[in-house]
């Protein structure tokens, strides 16, 4: 195997770490581990061939970053950390402070733009749910952040005096018990945020242009049946974006 093009892409989110080994054409291996169990990654990564490059999108804080550095140290490969910027890989940021945008959101936007090349929403349903808008010319127009499914249900259970209710239920248009009321309210709130942003982006781009929506993150499958707009689920959107960024960096000659 030619290892000179091997990339280890790592998506270090608030709840879990996703990773994949890519050879420039396809994924050779991939996995997912909870942040609380991230030291188990040593077993997964020891079995891999040494990558030529490592690119990480980390939003889980300094301790997670330090642990990743220690886990990856045996390969003696320089670690690259994804950061948001004003312009990259065809996407232009309108964020008031581009560097302040979460690197996972930025990388996901790059992946979505390369997939669709059209106006779209990028919805990442995780610990928090982000709903970000891309214009038809690849401009990141802005986005919203709301609590994700688990955070929303837990907050209601903890603070609404419903301590004995399990965090479960089923969706009903008109719920007739407390468990279903909690669950259905969570679904309505999250899908409402997505569909409101969809309407705003459709208005911005012009009603004649179809806006696509990409759902990603651990809660994407939970929301998908309840979203009544054009959409698709992409499981590893951030990892895709890391591959695109790494490929673009490889095309730029090194300077001293």
Curated annotation (Swiss-Prot):
Cofactor(s) needed for function: NH4(+); K(+)
Coiled coil region boundaries: none
InterPro entries: ATPase_NBD, Type_III_PanK
Gene3D superfamilies: 3.30.420.40
Gene Ontology molecular functions: ATP binding; metal ion binding; pantothenate kinase activity
EC number: 2.7.1.33
Broad class of enzyme this protein falls into: transferase
Signal peptide: none
Keyword Nucleotide-binding: yes
Associated pathway: Cofactor biosynthesis; coenzyme A biosynthesis; CoA from (R)-pantothenate: step 1/5
GO BP: coenzyme A biosynthetic process
SUPFAM superfamilies found in the cross-reference section: Actin-like ATPase domain
Predominant location: cytoplasm
Pfam families the record matches: Pan_kinase
Binding site for ATP: 11-18, 127
UniProt cofactor note: A monovalent cation. Ammonium or potassium.
One GO CC term, this protein: cytoplasm
Keyword Hydrolase part of the UniProt annotation: no
Keywords for this protein: ATP-binding, Coenzyme A biosynthesis, Cytoplasm, Kinase, Metal-binding, Nucleotide-binding, Potassium, Transferase
UniProt-annotated catalytic positions: 104
NCBIfam families with a match to the protein in the record: baf (TIGR00671)
Physiological role: Catalyzes the phosphorylation of pantothenate (Pan), the first step in CoA biosynthesis.
Subunit structure, as described in the record: Homodimer.
PANTHER family referenced in this protein's UniProt entry, alphabetically: TYPE III PANTOTHENATE KINASE (PTHR34265:SF1)
Similarity comment: Belongs to the type III pantothenate kinase family.
Record protein name field: Type III pantothenate kinase
Organism of this sequence: Nitrosomonas europaea (strain ATCC 19718 / CIP 103999 / KCTC 2705 / NBRC 14298)
